[in-house]
Amino acid sequence: MILYRIGEIIHKHNSNIIFESQGIGYSLILPDPERVEIKQKCKLYLFEIKNEYQYATYAFKDFKERLLFVDLISLNGIGPRAAFNILNFGFEKVVALIAEGNAEALIEIPYLNPRMARLIVAELQAKWSKMISPKDAAKINETTNTLSEVKETLKMVGFKTKQIDGALSKISSTDDVEKMIEEAIKLMSTQNYESATA
């Protein structure tokens, strides 16, 4: 089993990337792809899924992220695609929520139902609470709460979830809710996003 490769990202389309290492191109699936840029040299940790339903190689920015992916797919009812979707929410955010036992916040992840969220917390909280400091967990959770407040406010104004997520991915996260709302609305307006009642 190949644990990692060092190379360069030569193409990126959504979560699908082409990663060149030692003259060989690898087709990989990378959660939260906004973290990497084309032509960026980096080390990616790999995990290959090969069965009758799927043949794919997932890539991760660090070993702990890969470890969480493996932990997630070991749980009953959570497959590779579901685990990928969870990590796409943001590795640090997910770890902080698991460490705090915050199943309610985990439910905000698209396609993650309450039963799965409670299962993740029940099975993984003890392990992952030891792998993140309380200070870091509190800081990440504060940012997550701010983003949730901004999202809910923008939904009430009439923007779609997809519009909001797209705008928030392009602005800096701060503890100033009003400023983030103003920046998000400005961005969506200038880029001619189509607004509609949620």
UniProtKB/Swiss-Prot annotation:
Region Domain I: start-end pairs: 1-61
Biological process, per Gene Ontology: DNA recombination; DNA repair
Domain of life where this protein originates: Bacteria
Region listing for Flexible linker, in residue ranges: 140-144
Region called Domain III, residue ranges: 144-198
Summary of subunit composition and partner proteins: Homotetramer. Forms an RuvA(8)-RuvB(12)-Holliday junction (HJ) complex. HJ DNA is sandwiched between 2 RuvA tetramers; dsDNA enters through RuvA and exits via RuvB. An RuvB hexamer assembles on each DNA strand where it exits the tetramer. Each RuvB hexamer is contacted by two RuvA subunits (via domain III) on 2 adjacent RuvB subunits; this complex drives branch migration. In the full resolvosome a probable DNA-RuvA(4)-RuvB(12)-RuvC(2) complex forms which resolves the HJ.
Function: The RuvA-RuvB-RuvC complex processes Holliday junction (HJ) DNA during genetic recombination and DNA repair, while the RuvA-RuvB complex plays an important role in the rescue of blocked DNA replication forks via replication fork reversal (RFR). RuvA specifically binds to HJ cruciform DNA, conferring on it an open structure. The RuvB hexamer acts as an ATP-dependent pump, pulling dsDNA into and through the RuvAB complex. HJ branch migration allows RuvC to scan DNA until it finds its consensus sequence, where it cleaves and resolves the cruciform DNA.
The protein's name in its UniProt record: Holliday junction branch migration complex subunit RuvA
